[in-house]
From Swiss-Prot:
UniProt name for this protein: Hydroxyacylglutathione hydrolase, cytoplasmic isozyme
Cofactor: Zn(2+)
Keywords for the protein's UniProt record, in alphabetical order: Cytoplasm, Hydrolase, Metal-binding, Phosphoprotein, Zinc
Record EC number: 3.1.2.6
Binding site for substrate: 153, 188-190, 268-271
Originating species: Saccharomyces cerevisiae (strain ATCC 204508 / S288c) (Baker's yeast)
Length: 274
């Protein structure tokens, strides 16, 4: 399994990622969230372009799915005999041909991919959990549901739904035994800003060792995609630590009386105000 991260909209502030997921053994690939063709296509080799079997969206927002039609047209012109699918969570994803149900299994060459529906940021949000059975490598493409040390805004959902998405749907599908080997590839590079928010919850160095290490990494590296795992998220991401008394206190639950949805909603509101 190989993952190529492609920057999009960094100069305009969007700091999006497109990803080329490849099964190098079978020379097949998926192009995930290629919203900006002029930025994506020059980053692909001719062999990579020919290898694309599907354009894949994590959700329908323009900065993830608006490149579908142009990319599809380009790839068909490049290889007229090939069939390129468009995979997404709803008909709102342009040119979509496959809308997978929750936990639908798909294959890319030898790679096994589970489609985890995570409605909240949008109703059609999907995270794609990938396993390479040959090497046992694993990763997950989380779009705007899970960011490194953060999560997406609840545009079309609630705190309860985001809690379910992060802490049930993703974690339980992947399985605790696989958290430490499942690398996270989010839709945006928001990590540095997220660290500033999380530091308000754990203000002292030493309170959260995982956060300290993430902060140090961010001080030296611009790109964090694929560098951290689900286990890391459970250790430093407050949206995945709702049972932590420090997270509860930061949200305003001083007597441990709030339910998880209330804590999640308040955390998101606090992050929105930053």
């Amino acid at each position: 399994m190989q993952v190529k991260s492609i920057k999009m909209r960094w100069e305009s502030g969007g700091v999006n990622y497109c990803y080329l997921l490849s099964d190098s053994k079978n020379k097949k690939s998926w192009l995930i969230d290629p919203a900006e063709p002029p930025e994506v296509l020059p980053e692909l080799t001719e062999d990579e372009k020919i290898s694309v079997e599907a354009i894949v969206n994590t959700h329908h927002h323009y900065d993830h799915a608006d490149g579908n039609a142009d990319i599809l047209k380009y790839l068909k012109e490049k290889n007229p005999t090939s069939k390129v699918e468009v995979i997404g969570g709803s008909k709102d994803c342009p040119k979509v041909t496959i809308i997978p149900e929750n936990l639908k299994k798909l294959h890319l060459g030898d790679l096994e991919i589970t489609c985890i529906r995570t409605p909240c940021h949008t109703r059609d949000s999907i995270c794609y959990y990938v396993k390479d059975p040959t090497t046992d490598e694993r990763c997950i493409f989380t779009g705007d549901t899970l960011f490194t040390a953060g999560c997406g805004r609840f545009f079309e959902g609630t705190g309860e739904e985001m809690d379910i998405a992060l802490n049930n749907s993703i974690l339980e599908t992947v399985g605790r035994q696989n958290w430490s080997k499942t690398r996270v590839y989010p839709g945006h590079e928001y990590t540095s800003d997220n660290v500033k928010f999380v530091r308000k919850i754990y203000p002292q160095v030493g309170e959260n060792k995982a956060l300290d290490e993430l902060e140090q990494f961010c001080s030296k590296h611009e790109v964090t995609a694929g560098r951290f795992t689900l286990k890391d998220e459970v250790e430093f991401n407050p949206f995945m630590r709702l049972e932590d008394p420090k997270v509860q206190k930061a949200a305003g639950d001083t007597n441990n009386s709030w339910d998880r949805a209330q804590i999640m909603d308040k955390l998101r509101a606090m992050k929105n105000r930053m």
